[in-house]
Amino acid sequence: MKNILFISGFLILISIQSSFAQSSLDDEIILIQSSFGMDKKQIIEGYMDLPESIAPSFWSIYQAYEAERTMLARERMNIINDFLTEYDKIGNDEANDLAKRTLKNDLELSKLHSAYYKKFKKATSALDAAKFMQIDTYIHNTIRNAMQQELPFIDQ
């Protein structure tokens, strides 16, 4: 399972890197999120292996969750883009702004997870809700870590 997730994440990163030179930031974000959403859903569907009796409720909540999470991912990409654009001239004000925006984005993602954990638990079970949160967090942390490795450190 880890190999499938790593390969999926790696392929997404390759498409991210090649698409940055081809279109505007918003077009790239839409392209990445639409292709990632399909791959991610397939991974989650295979991992969750939900019974037919609860699958429709789960996927309905999942769609709403993904819509909100995608907006947070879009903001994260904007923060990264701003960092890369301003990298050569980052001073105290720019660093402060980027740090505050990143912390706010992290907090909003935690709030989203908390709110949707309750919804998933109500529609399925605590076990299924925890299982979803675990795989979702794993997927996104894998991708975030791979992206972070490509970013330069401030003032280096």
Kindly label every feature range from the protein language model.
Residues 1-27:
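Bacterial Sec-dependent N-terminal signal peptides
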